[in-house]
Amino acid sequence: SEPTMQKPRVLMMAAGTGGHVFPAIAVAQALQQSGAQVHWLGTLVGMENELLQHYDFSYHAINMQGLRGNGIKRLFKAPSTLLKATLAAIKIIKTNKIDIVVGFGGYVTAPGGLAAKFCKKPILIHEQNAIAGMSNNYLSKLANQVLEAFPNTFTELPSSKVMTVGNPVREAIVQVPPPKARIDVNDTSPLKLLVIGGSLGAQALNNHIAPTLKKLESMPDAKPWQVRHQCGKNNQEATQAVYSEAQLQSTQYEILPFVKDMAEAYSWADVIVCRAGAL
């Protein structure tokens, strides 16, 4: 009988924001469907902990936090934190016999990438933004292959190492019916507005959507609105206050810190207002 091919063991690295985590989930699902064994390297406190509960990936958490804007004390602790996190990642790679490491960004990718290099494992990274984040910028020098969503993100690297591939999208999002199939122009029910500020929220949207809706209400032949406003987990009270202050009459609204099921939200909406970002 023919020898059975061993399933490749892939370590995904993505943490911190939905912009890193959601595209990584899309790739992880595709890898899993093609027979790979998917492991995930995340942090102890990042949003990826909650997001990944619905998926069948082996989750490994290490203690790693960001360095930007967090004071001099953390900066002095940074080398020791990075070293400990890298050693923890090396142990994870060796214990689980990882074959390849795939990084999508977030602070966890720095120790994970260093660990992969130490263990002589191939590194592939994907950058979702037009301008690379700090971790991916550093890791691009160590990576065997660099994937970018937008052209010319990594102009300093040899072109043979970089491939422009766009952003991975989860299957559930791809299957959202097109507007023509969902929206009836003769429908007189309220227009459904979805406001998406990204996983951390967007201040401009949180401050200006409610006053804008108030102006729309005062227009002749104004249609009523039904609003779902995703404001970021630390902005719920402030955004609620902006809506209360606007004293909306015909608008129904719901303030959400985070939208877990984006496919359902997209299907529900007639109009979407979102900030520019990775996705």
Language-model features: where?
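An amphipathic, basic-hydrophobic alpha-helix
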Residues: 71-100
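Active-site-proximal region of nucleotide-activated glycan assembly enzymes
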Residues: 37, 47, 58, 117-179
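Donor-nucleotide binding loops and adjacent catalytic segments primarily
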Residues: 46, 51, 55, 178-274
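Short amphipathic alpha-helix
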Residues: 20-31
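Alpha-helix C-terminal capping/helix-to-coil transition sites in glycosyltransferase folds
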Residues: 95-97, 141-142, 264-268
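Conserved nucleotide-sugar phosphate-binding/catalytic loop shared by glycosyltransferases and other
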Residues: 7-15, 34-80, 231-235
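Hydrophobic acceptor-binding patch used for acceptor engagement in glycosyltransferases
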Residues: 101, 271-272, 279
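An aromatic- and histidine-rich active-site surface loop
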Residues: 46-50, 100-119
